[in-house]
Amino acid sequence: MFWLIKKEFLYNFRYKMRTLNLFFNPFFMIAPYVLLAENYQAGSRILGSMILWSWLVQLIYGISYGIESLKIEGVLGIILMSPIHFIGYQFAYYIYLIFHQLLVTGITLILTYIFLGVTVDNTLMFFGTLIISSVGLFCFTVGYSSFVLKYKKMQGINTTLQNVFGFLSGYTIPVKKFPVVLRFASYLIPLTYAIYAMDIEYAVSPIYICMFALISLVWLVVGVIFVNKNLNSMKKRGDFEQW
């Protein structure tokens, strides 16, 4: 597992232009929205919520949508024949992404402060929220990956779904302003709880923490069950590659 983490770091730092793109791209993507929100005294809130959302996006690309890349590259079959379970492989990649995203987030916050004069409130608590919420986001992406394994057409709507998840989680508009039906859907996404915690300055009640833990656990259980089921079906069909 630790070899997999080391491999990802070595791969990224071997290709320096790719590394620079990964490190600095989030700032240029987030900056226009932060500048616009700053006109309404909401720059700090939008900055924090979009960084939280970017963590979900990276986890989806690395853990869920990344399955498509593994199939195209012919690597998925090798992973399934290795001693490590596929969920273990996903967990190893999740650990790598935590360190990667912490570094990217730090660079993004420094750049937004230098060039935009905007930063998040209570930086220490914000980083703590990022790390804790990433556990729920990992559970969510494991569940999401079961759909990627089952339905090939997920590849075509992946980017759209990422934006839907971000919107429902309240990365632009607080969830409490949504209609009841949308609010119900929002609370099925672990990211919602992280953004809400930031909105209320991290004064989260135990009930809210329990809801976050329960939703995350449900996604993990559903993901593990259906990932194993779909992988067994792929093994029977020999469908490990995609051309």
Predicted regions and their residues:
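Hydrophobic transmembrane alpha-helices and immediately adjacent juxtamembrane helices
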Residues: 1-131, 135-243
